[in-house]
């Protein structure tokens, strides 16, 4: 092998594959490749990420464990010895001499973006071009390198944001799937428990549960695969960006001769680099939680719920039969009794729940905002209200026409393929069960709050929210369940 080529190969061997400069504090990983300690840290350290997160080698993509990183002292010694030769990775050993004329390379052709000697600059192909000393264009190209670097940094920041977003979406998906899985099990158990009080079971519920869970598992796996692919592609793009940024930083520190080497190719590649957006993936669960016949059982626990006008906020209009409520145009002159809500559009039912099972349905129609559920009898009605079980509220609500939530932001947004026009509420006091159902969607399950002992008596909760122009004006109406099939 030619000695010159051999030395060049050695110089390249002691360069970090990530930053393309001499290895600094070289670290070896499981697969045997070595990188700068700082490069690996920047590539792998993800704020707030667990150490159990999957890592791969930037070169061969082999799985590795960060805890197995080890310093490569022998390689570090070789790097220091090669550094004494005052060479740089990518420079080669032919130095500053023109291969054609043997003269020093010190001129630069602006049109062709080429380094050349004086003899080349006077040749016919360049005599009409603008050829200047290399130093005259050094700052111009340093600035272009800076602009390209800023562009890549912005792309890197966007890639990081997208990566964080994909991790959050993955976490949200896992929570939704686990919540739906729990709901399926609970709802079938509830059906069996309630049915045994009425008549012996006549269905193979175990097979129905297994089928529903199998469908959920298939859907979860398909979506999870897509989410993981998105995340993997973003990580790969981040790694490419990291290497390109490191290359530009290193190039800007080179002597002018080596900074300008192939400069146009580097700039074109950097400036044209564009982050590929992740594939849009719906997180809407298609496997619903639906138990055939459950609503018929729940209706046997129908409660005669009526609104208590003494609790109604001053702009809420309660019908004479106390079955409907809507938001009025003006404040009514009502006594400020202790039971009345002072700040919020809330009215409560008049019947206390302290034992037993109770079920009622409320027509919400095409309203864009509403809230339904139960609350403690002794909640604060004059100050700020937090719709959380911690503060005595078990409520689901619709906001902005399509955002369904259970309580406050402590629970994820609910996925409802069919917007409910009628909502069923079921309370089993002794079982600590507060559940909601989409009657419009054949009684599919909406949400069940985690089961904790209730801290006293409960009251039905209603909030028609505000009227928004001509929208959200229809009343909330408690439905009669008598005589229904």
Curated annotation (Swiss-Prot):
What are its GO biological-process terms?
Answer: innate immune response; protein autoubiquitination; regulation of androgen receptor signaling pathway; regulation of gene expression
Name of encoding gene: TRIM68
Q: Which UniProt keywords apply?
A: Coiled coil, Cytoplasm, Metal-binding, Nucleus, Transferase, Ubl conjugation, Ubl conjugation pathway, Zinc, Zinc-finger
MF (Gene Ontology): histone acetyltransferase binding; identical protein binding; nuclear androgen receptor binding; ubiquitin protein ligase activity; ubiquitin-protein transferase activity; zinc ion binding
Q: Which family does it belong to?
A: Belongs to the TRIM/RBCC family.
| Domain comment as written in the entry | The RING domain is essential for ubiquitin E3 ligase activity.
The organism's place on the tree of life at top rank: Eukaryota
State the protein's name: E3 ubiquitin-protein ligase TRIM68
Q: What is its main location?
A: cytoplasm
Q: Where are the zinc fingers (RING-type)?
A: 16-61
The enzyme's main class, written as a single word, is transferase
Q: What Enzyme Commission number(s) does the record list for this chain?
A: 2.3.2.27
Q: Would you indicate the residue range of the signal peptide?
A: none
| One Pfam family in the UniProt entry | zf-C3HC4_4
């Amino acid at each position: 092998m030619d000695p010159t080529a051999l030395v060049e190969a050695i110089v390249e061997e002691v360069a970090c594959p990530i930053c393309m400069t001499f290895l600094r504090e070289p670290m070896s990983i499981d697969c045997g490749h070595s990188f700068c300690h700082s490069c690996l840290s920047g590539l792998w350290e993800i704020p707030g990420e667990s150490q159990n997160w999957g890592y791969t080698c930037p070169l061969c993509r082999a799985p590795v464990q960060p805890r197995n990183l080890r310093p490569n002292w022998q390689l570090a010694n070789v790097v220091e010895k090669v550094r004494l030769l005052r060479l740089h990775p990518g420079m080669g050993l032919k130095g500053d001499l023109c291969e054609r004329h043997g003269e020093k390379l010190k001129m630069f052709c602006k049109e062709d973006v080429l380094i050349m000697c004086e003899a080349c600059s006077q040749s016919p192909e360049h005599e009409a071009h603008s050829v200047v000393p290399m130093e005259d264009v050094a700052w111009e190209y340093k600035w272009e390198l800076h602009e390209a670097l800023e562009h890549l940094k912005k792309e890197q920041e966007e890639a990081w944001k997208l990566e964080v977003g994909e991790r959050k979406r993955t976490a949200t998906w896992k929570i939704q799937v686990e919540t739906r899985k729990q709901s399926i099990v609970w709802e079938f158990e509830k059906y069996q428990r309630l049915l045994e009080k009425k008549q012996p079971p006549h269905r193979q519920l175990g097979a129905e549960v297994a089928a529903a869970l199998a469908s959920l598992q298939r859907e979860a796996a398909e979506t999870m695969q897509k989410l993981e692919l998105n995340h993997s592609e973003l990580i790969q793009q981040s790694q490419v960006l990291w290497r390109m940024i490191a290359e530009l930083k290193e190039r800007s520190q080179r002597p002018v001769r080596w900074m300008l080497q192939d400069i146009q190719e580097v700039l074109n590649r950097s400036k044209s680099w564009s982050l590929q957006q992740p594939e849009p993936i719906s997180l809407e669960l298609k496997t619903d939680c639906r138990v055939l016949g459950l609503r018929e059982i729940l209706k046997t626990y129908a409660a005669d719920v009526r609104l208590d006008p003494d609790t109604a906020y001053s702009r809420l209009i309660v019908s004479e039969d106390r079955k409907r409520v809507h938001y009025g145009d003006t404040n009514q002159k009502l006594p400020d009794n202790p039971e009345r809500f002072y700040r919020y559009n809330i009215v409560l039912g008049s019947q206390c729940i302290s034992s037993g099972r109770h079920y009622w349905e409320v027509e919400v129609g095409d309203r864009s905002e509403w809230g339904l559920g139960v609350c403690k009898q002794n909640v604060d009605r004059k100050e700020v209200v937090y719709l959380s079980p911690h503060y005595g509220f078990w409520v689901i609500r619709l906001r902005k026409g399509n955002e369904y939530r259970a309580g406050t932001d402590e629970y994820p947004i609910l996925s409802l393929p069919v917007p409910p026009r009628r909502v069923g509420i079921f309370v089993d006091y002794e079982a600590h069960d507060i559940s909601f159902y989409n009657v419009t969607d054949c009684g599919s399950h909406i949400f069940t709050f985690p089961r904790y002992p209730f801290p006293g008596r409960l009251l039905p909760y209603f909030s028609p929210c505000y009227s928004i122009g001509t929208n959200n004006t229809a009343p909330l109406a408690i439905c009669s369940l008598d005589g229904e099939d």
